[in-house]
């Protein structure tokens, strides 16, 4: 049986060490014990054919939520019975229907296209291309989103032996403050919002960015953008972590605290479900794990003594828009409702902007196929529409060739034009939450919410339990439900189970993937232009880095690195010392290692 539907890293780990993802009780599980065509009559429940034990794809969503054939006023969903409490009007608590009464009539979503490859100069050129494609009188609210290469994501310099062969391959290589200057050269960073997709070394990259702004004489209060900075989901799904969960969470709080005091227009963390979904989770798991990660950061900030009204309005979220059209819309509606209630009722926030969930949405990379890649344009268009109908504040549309390599300029342009057609030709911007009030949509939103809340309760109970005000002075980061869930392997196990189930459904033909398991073209020509990165990029980047190190004042650099160690050792906020480190020409890898000298590096898996 072909296991191609399990994400590659996840599949390889399951096959070679099933206990790591699925727990010791599953260690002897055979991944391929029966043929997919063999009925499994032990399975039953809503949406399952009792004769075959197989799902009815017309009755169950991708996430396994059973659907009725039709919805009528004879069985109104709970939310419609309690309209003001559960749904209300757009712009009114609990914001199920959106944050603002006029929706996209007064402000379109930000068209934020992800870009990054090769050197800082290469990516700067792509940034300028993207800005040029969006600079019109009707679409001025654009932003940049930066993809970093694997060495940068792991906090390693380009000349590190572990970086060899990866420099500039899946994103841009950033080692120094000079790289940061080249990356944003001739771009008015006080006018364009900048998103940085970086997590484990997020505090260091952000420090370099702030130091660059200082050298350009741009006040920090003029900077707008978003730092992804969501380290918890790295332990759940993406595996790009450096420090232990407790120290990693502390660094997130450092950035949140520094942002609230010095960079008021910046979103200090983008709490990300996208990667959780890409790893194979269901929509409800994505929603629950993302919200609970956000709650973990809120609780860590309260333990630090921060004022919730100071930091909560700048928290943001990042969700996936997958193929199950209505489920994705329901997910975003339920997300706003749950978050608003948690912030108001559980954490006591009074300012309505602290209740707001601002969301960025990206179409589902894991849904794109190598086979018949032009079909991906259609997939992305529908997914983008789901994100918009769900009320996102910004949107990234994937390029159709991203399963094959880095996107070409033509593919990037088509992806961007998809958003522009959606915004200006379809009419979806004219009415806020146009599906609101639908018997089906409200019932599905309720169902997604209920399943997500059940997951959140499980995670709460793995730690200190549901938040109480006294925990601000009696608890620590170590007691958080997410931190404890990481150590117990909860998140990886749940994601692996969902991923494996979806894989089986696809291979059995229960889930049709056009061009892959149905409507296959045996004579298909897959010759699609792809963007490749020359080995010369790495050679030049390493040479430039070594020249940078040779010309700096080593005594100043050494003193700055020691200051970073001292701040970490004394449990201080590391941001001021990191900014000074960037100004003293410390490299990314050096500053990351200075903190690793104190916090250590996390190499262990779940404690099973």
Show the residue positions of the predicted features.
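Short beta-alpha connecting loops at secondary-structure transitions
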Residues: 165-168, 233-243, 276-281, 319-324, ...
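Flexible, glycine-rich loop/tail regions that form catalytic "lids" or insertion modules at the edges
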Residues: 40-41, 46-53, 59-76, 148-150, ...
């Amino acid at each position: 049986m072909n296991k191609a539907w399990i994400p590659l890293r996840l599949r390889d780990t399951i096959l070679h060490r099933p206990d790591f993802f699925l727990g010791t009780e599953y260690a002897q599980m055979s991944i391929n014990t029966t043929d997919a065509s063999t009925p499994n009559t032990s399975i039953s429940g809503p949406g399952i054919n009792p004769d075959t034990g197989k799902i009815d794809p017309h009755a169950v969503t991708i996430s396994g939520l059973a659907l009725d054939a039709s919805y009528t006023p004879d069985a109104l969903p709970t939310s419609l019975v309690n309209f003001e409490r559960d749904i209300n009007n757009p712009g009114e608590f609990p914001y199920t229907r959106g944050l603002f009464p006029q929706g996209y009539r007064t402000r379109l979503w930000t068209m934020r296209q992800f870009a990054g490859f090769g050197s800082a100069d290469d990516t700067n050129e792509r940034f300028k291309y993207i800005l040029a494609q969006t600079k019109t009188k009707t679409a001025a609210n654009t932003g940049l989103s930066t993809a970093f290469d694997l060495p940068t994501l792991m906090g390693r310099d380009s000349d590190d032996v572990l970086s060899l062969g990866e420099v500039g391959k899946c994103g841009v290589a950033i080692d120094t403050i000079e790289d940061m200057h080249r990356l944003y050269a001739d771009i008015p960073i006080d006018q364009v919002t900048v998103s940085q997709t970086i997590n484990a070394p997020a505090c260091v990259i952000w420090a370099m960015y702030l130091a660059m702004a200082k050298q350009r004489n741009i006040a920090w209060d003029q900077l707008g953008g978003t730092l992804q900075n969501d380290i918890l989901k790295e332990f759940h799904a993406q595996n790009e972590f450096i420090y232990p969960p407790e120290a990693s969470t502390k660094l997130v709080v450092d950035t949140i605290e520094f942002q609230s005091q010095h960079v008021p227009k910046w979103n200090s963390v983008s709490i990300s479900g996208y990667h959780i979904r890409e790893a194979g989770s269901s929509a409800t798991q994505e929603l629950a794990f993302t919200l609970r990660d956000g709650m973990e950061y809120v609780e860590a900030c309260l333990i630090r003594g921060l004022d919730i009204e100071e930091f909560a309005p700048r928290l943001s979220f990042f969700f996936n828009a997958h193929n199950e059209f209505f489920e994705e819309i329901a997910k975003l509606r339920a997300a706003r409702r749950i978050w608003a209630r948690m912030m108001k009722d559980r954490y006591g926030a009074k300012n309505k902007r602290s209740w707001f969930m601002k969301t960025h949405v990206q179409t589902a990379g894991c849904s794109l196929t190598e086979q018949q890649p032009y079909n991906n344009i259609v997939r992305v268009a529908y997914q983008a529409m789901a994100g918009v109908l769900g009320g996102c504040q910004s949107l990234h549309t994937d390029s159709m060739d991203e399963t094959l390599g880095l996107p070409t300029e033509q593919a990037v342009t088509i992806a961007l034009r998809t958003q522009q057609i959606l915004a200006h030709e379809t009419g979806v911007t004219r009415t806020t939450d146009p599906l609101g009030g639908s018997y089906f949509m409200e019932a599905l939103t309720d169902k997604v919410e209920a399943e997500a809340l059940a997951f959140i309760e499980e995670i709460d109970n793995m730690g200190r339990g549901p938040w109480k005000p006294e925990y601000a002075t009696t608890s620590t980061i170590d007691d958080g439900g997410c931190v404890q869930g990481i150590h117990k392997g909860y998140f990886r196990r749940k994601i692996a189970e969902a991923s494996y189930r979806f894989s089986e459904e696809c291979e059995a033909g229960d889930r049709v993937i056009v061009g892959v398991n149905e409507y296959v073209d045996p004579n298909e020509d897959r010759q699609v232009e792809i963007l490749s990165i020359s080995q010369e990029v790495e050679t030049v980047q390493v040479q430039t880095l070594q020249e940078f190190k040779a010309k700096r004042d080593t005594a100043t650099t050494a003193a700055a690195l020691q200051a970073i160690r001292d701040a970490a050792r004394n449990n201080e906020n590391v941001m001021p010392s990191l900014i000074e480190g960037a100004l003293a020409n410390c490299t990314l890898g050096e500053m990351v290692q200075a903190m690793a000298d104190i916090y250590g590096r996390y190499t262990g898996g779940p404690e099973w």
